[in-house]
């Protein structure tokens, strides 16, 4: 059975995917309804011929959305923090073309921080895991904006469009499996934990007026039992190893 006919002739042929009027569903560019049947893939690594074959196979199975995992930053030791991986961007460009021709839309995940932080990035805590840093470290935040801009604004030689202007690119995933409420926060290095403590203390003081007033407003349920017991005396909130 070949379900290719269920997909559009070319994805994005009617414009960008958008939300319905009630914001509960997706619709095509012409306003018609669309439901996504999706898979995740690393096919940007394939040869051009295999990309075409892969997308044709997915369309035959009834798939109309491919989630493409591409970590754009260059995390190899020796790279600058602003460096991007040109081969990854080039592979994504070619895959997007293959997807378009088979009626597949693309969801792109450009940042998956489960890698070792290169010393050459000159970020506090280098040599350790990168999880959580996007929420804490200003240098990583600035670099993230640069990586993302590079990926979405470079012209795709196969389509003549930048990714940001290509209706085949339906959904942008800004972050993948990373959070200060995720288990990886337990692996923050001491320098980054100190930065997090400083950020949190500034927020508490802005909200309550002082560290003491923040402490007074926090209730009594866990006082004497957690890592914030030193707020009144230290004047700061210390984020320990089990935040």
Whereabouts are the PLM-identified features?
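Non-catalytic propeptide/linker segments at domain boundaries
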Residues: 1-13
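Active-site mouth of glycoside hydrolases
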Residues: 10-243
């Amino acid at each position: 059975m070949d379900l290719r006919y269920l997909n559009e002739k070319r994805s994005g042929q009617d414009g960008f995917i958008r939300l319905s009027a009630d914001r509960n569903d997706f619709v095509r560019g012409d306003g018609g309804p669309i439901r996504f049947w999706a898979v995740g893939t690393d096919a940007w690594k394939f040869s051009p011929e295999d990309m075409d074959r892969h997308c044709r196979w997915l369309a035959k199975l009834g798939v109309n959305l491919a989630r493409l995992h591409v970590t754009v930053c260059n995390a190899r030791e020796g790279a600058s923090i602003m460096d991007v991986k040109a081969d990854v961007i080039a592979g994504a460009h070619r895959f997007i073309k293959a997807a378009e021709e088979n009626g597949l839309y693309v969801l792109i995940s450009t940042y998956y921080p489960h890698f070792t932080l290169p010393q050459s990035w000159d970020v506090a805590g280098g040599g350790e895991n990168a999880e959580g840093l996007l929420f804490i470290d200003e240098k990583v935040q600035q670099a993230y904006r640069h990586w993302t801009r590079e990926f979405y604004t470079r012209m795709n030689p196969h389509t003549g469009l930048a990714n940001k202007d290509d209706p085949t690119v339906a959904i942008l995933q800004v972050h993948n499996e990373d959070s200060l409420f995720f288990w990886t926060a337990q692996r923050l290095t001491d320098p980054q934990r100190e930065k997090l403590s400083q950020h949190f203390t500034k927020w508490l003081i802005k909200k309550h007026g002082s560290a003491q007033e923040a402490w007074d407003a926090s209730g009594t349920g866990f006082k004497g039992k957690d890592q914030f017991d030193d707020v009144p005396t230290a004047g700061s909130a210390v984020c320990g190893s089990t935040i």
